[in-house]
């Protein structure tokens, strides 16, 4: 696991809880993960957000470029991961996930793996 396209709504509660969940699931490996939110560039597209973010995650793997959290200046309290602030980062991504958390508890995590075949 190299990259997470976070749900990342830039709200204190969501970002703090998502960061905590990433640390809970990945333990010490969380420090090695690149985490960004494509919503920082597109805004929240409501029902279309999950689909677009899945495409962005797959394209990040295919092109070896992690999209930035473009507008991040100061992460909130409890948000201490590598949020790829400011500009994109070249990186080989073997496995990535895209988080999508919907209103009313409809939540999904899609896992993508690079295919070299």
Residue ranges and their predicted role:
Residues 2-117:
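Conserved "HGTGT" condensation-loop signature of ketosynthase/thiolase-family condensing enzymes
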